[in-house]
Amino acid sequence: MVKLAIDMMGGDNAPDIVLEAVQKAVEDFKDLEIILFGDEKKYNLNHERIEFRHCSEKIEMEDEPVRAIKRKKDSSMVKMAEAVKSGEADGCVSAGNTGALMSAGLFIVGRIKGVARPALVVTLPTIDGKGFVFLDVGANADAKPEHLLQYAQLGDIYAQKIRGIDNPKISLLNIGTEPAKGNSLTKKSYELLNHDHSLNFVGNIEAKTLMDGDTDVVVTDGYTGNMVLKNLEGTAKSIGKMLKDTIMSSTKNKLAGAILKKDLAEFAKKMDYSEYGGSVLLGLEGTVVKAHGSSNAKAFYSAIRQAKIAGEQNIVQTMKETVGESNE
């Protein structure tokens, strides 16, 4: 049995989509228990494997992260993180303030001893449909080569345990594929990754080939990773809008769109980030999953499923035994 703590109040569409996703999750997974944290006036679920705990405060999207965690002690996000810290819950999921959730992860859940800097990881789609693990996407703006090596170690475990990939191929995001390409950070990181024989490091990868499906894990610093992530999200939205506008521009195009409707739907599903769940803050003493702030019920459900798999696979313990102990 896996028990998860859920922030009912975080996100643009909370609590409705959270309640819908939780209801579906407990129906689909008979070995899942949920502790919901939020406003009792907005709670309307009744299930033997769902426990509700009232919280008098909520962390808003515009709140300053660290200050909010310290001052709003009875907020749904803080109480959720405390449930993970105490061991009452195996992991947690929130669509709330990203900075506040990372602060709650660091200051409440706690960092694994030996992990220098936790990393935020996300699974992104590829043209072949299998996707790839990408980190860091914003936990740390600055990074040293040693941090990128550790990100690769964390990503390697994540790809194996969560995505079920044996001996995942690991790449370093760079401006060229040659070993000597890049700045001092990427050059030194390349050396460290190449000398870690526990990793299946396959070399550099350029941004233009990220979605080709040639690798399983891509490592970069949080500043670069966040910009790449937002660029991909923005590009996908723009292409979708352009395609829709083109289809609706004439009768001929509308007929073509109708003929291709099924194929376009399959393509959209393949490229839908919500199929992969949320982003995960790796390197903590518990599983912390960040669902997208604008998540619908489907995306939040995927994030719950992701946290459940992490609990089943005992990913935190694996990280303690490998990354943590090797860096003490």
From Swiss-Prot:
GO terms for cellular component: cytoplasm. SUPFAM superfamilies: Isocitrate/Isopropylmalate dehydrogenase-like. It is found in: Cytoplasm. Pathway: Lipid metabolism; phospholipid metabolism. GO terms for biological process: fatty acid biosynthetic process; phospholipid biosynthetic process. Its EC number is 2.3.1.274. The keyword Lipid metabolism applies. One of its GO terms (molecular function) is phosphate:acyl-[acyl carrier protein] acyltransferase activity. It catalyses: a fatty acyl-[ACP] + phosphate = an acyl phosphate + holo-[ACP]. Coiled coil: none annotated. It holds the Pfam family FA_synthesis. The keyword Nucleotidyltransferase does not apply. PANTHER family: FATTY ACID/PHOSPHOLIPID SYNTHESIS PROTEIN PLSX (PTHR30100), PHOSPHATE ACYLTRANSFERASE (PTHR30100:SF1). Homodimer. Probably interacts with PlsY. Belongs to the PlsX family. This is Phosphate acyltransferase. It comes from Staphylococcus aureus (strain NCTC 8325 / PS 47).
